[in-house]
Swiss-Prot record:
One of its GO terms (molecular function) is ribonuclease M5 activity. Binds two Mg(2+) per subunit. Mg(2+) 2 binds at residues 58, 60. Its cofactor is Mg(2+). This is Ribonuclease M5. One of its GO terms (cellular component) is cytoplasm. Required for correct processing of both the 5' and 3' ends of 5S rRNA precursor. Cleaves both sides of a double-stranded region yielding mature 5S rRNA in one step. Disulfide bonds: none annotated. It comes from Streptococcus pneumoniae (strain ATCC BAA-255 / R6). It catalyses: Endonucleolytic cleavage of RNA, removing 21 and 42 nucleotides, respectively, from the 5'- and 3'-termini of a 5S-rRNA precursor. SUPFAM superfamilies: Toprim domain (SSF110455).
Length: 186
């Protein structure tokens, strides 16, 4: 028997839905790629009010764009993230795009078990720009790799140098959590 997920999961396309339904008893809302509009936002808002919504978009530029648009309009939605290597096609005949449709059951289950939501208590946020510089996220030859590693480890997605502080604040990540996550960075 498939595990039931009570929230509606927002995905980009039909193949994402097919893969999720292969393993879970779940309802999805498809944005049809990056072509999200005001009607989509209104529908997602209604779904969120009735069932709750998990945004589970591809770990690429368009997926992050869709996620930001939804997060701006509906800050209380939840988020699930796949690591980039979990979204790579397993077969060369499937193309080179990243997507939820390529993820294994274990990777999907892990991502959905670690759903996060936007953090609303900014006063408790304890990370500064100087902390990010000290930890090598904003300056240095491997700063991009460090940010990628952090985003994957904390399952908050990739952020560029300008967005990292805001992303950490949105998800209520503490300095201690960042330092702990980076202990295993090699």
């Amino acid at each position: 028997m498939k595990e039931r997920i009570s929230q509606v999961i927002v995905v980009e396309g039909r193949d994402d839905t097919v893969n999720l339904k292969r393993y879970f008893d779940v309802e999805t809302y498809e944005t049809r790629g990056s072509a999200i509009n005001d009607q989509d936002i209104e529908r997602i808002q209604r779904l969120h009010q009735r069932h709750g919504v998990i945004v589970f978009t591809d770990p690429d530029f368009n997926g992050e764009r869709i996620r930001r648009m939804i997060m701006t309009a509906i800050p209380t939605v939840q988020h699930a993230f796949l690591k980039r290597d979990e979204a790579v096609p397993k077969s060369k005949t499937k193309g080179r795009s990243l997507g939820i449709e390529h993820a294994s059951y274990e990777d999907l289950k892990t991502a959905l078990a670690q759903v996060t939501e936007q953090f609303e208590h900014e006063s408790q946020f304890d990370i500064s720009r100087s902390d990010l510089i000290r930890l090598g996220f904003l300056a240095g030859a491997d700063s991009r790799k460090r940010r990628e590693y952090l985003g994957e480890t904390l399952r908050i997605g990739y952020s560029n140098g300008k967005q990292l502080l805001k992303r950490l604040e949105l998800f209520g990540v503490t300095l201690a959590e960042v330092e702990e996550a980076m202990k295993s960075y090699e």
